[in-house]
């Protein structure tokens, strides 16, 4: 059979497996690639190829992650699987592998376990928008009522964390049997793939979102005005459009009078491009690194937010000692460090290196932010943690 060439025409979606240790996440990942390759073409990946996950560094944090790809007739999927619980925590908080949807694997023999709950909570905190459930090891449960009970428990758990538990697709299967080529269970993998296609909507592309450019540098060009440079994070800015400068100080409205890239003039700057944007009537001192240029009204500056953070372990170059309430590090957003104070949850007195924790942060200056924005926690320029804005407060 000839090798399929990679089709860029298919919509691309990022997914991953989450769930309790030993419930079969990696076996399921192998089963999906194997069954879909057999059914629709593509390449299968063996369990041990996936299980020996290579180490990656994201924001200085060591994460073991396996990446596999597979196709359905409708879409191309990139799928992440992590060997250890700590890897999941780090992956979800740093956004190293952004997920448009997740497959929650729950062993029917065990039902929901502590990490099942923790992964659902993390999914809610870091903004995983959709979860599909795969009830695994159903070949080992003879009692239909027991399966009903486990399914009900999982649905209730999802609802508890504001996922639509009643409407979530739940597929009952056996990853191992499917991997062994048992047709009855292979059909369940196809059912799962169909659920991925139908339940997870096509993600919005960065270019279709409202314009935003984190400002990295500001120059004054005599006779022309002020130029800000940076990489367009999302959307498009066209010459002649109104834009806002947001963050740190009061928001200012201005107009984009020119866009240039590599000293060439353009009529627009698009997501992913490094550009200089010329601003009409804006003084050099009105703009600074750390602010963002954005479509008017699309983003607001905030100082207080709830976040989910991972604190680097000593081995990762993090702190050697715990920190307590009253800790005042810098929070690095996009291009700037801002000092902030923290509030720990009720009953949490200290946070150890290697822990993940929910905390409320109060910044001394407002930063343009939305839920889902990633940040680093730094002490004197050294990264000691990573976090994500779970919910803007004020």
From Swiss-Prot:
One term of GO molecular function: GTPase activity
Role description: GTP hydrolase that promotes the GTP-dependent binding of aminoacyl-tRNA to the A-site of ribosomes during protein biosynthesis.
NCBIfam families, alphabetized: EF-Tu, PRK00049.1, PRK12735.1, PRK12736.1, small_GTP
GO cellular component: cytosol
Stretches assigned to the tr-type G domain: 10-204
Major site of localization recorded for this protein: cytoplasm
Presence of the UniProt keyword Aminoacyl-tRNA synthetase in the record: no
Gene from which this protein is expressed: tuf1
Name of the protein in its database record: Elongation factor Tu 1
Region (G2): 60-64
Family: Belongs to the TRAFAC class translation factor GTPase superfamily. Classic translation factor GTPase family. EF-Tu/EF-1A subfamily.
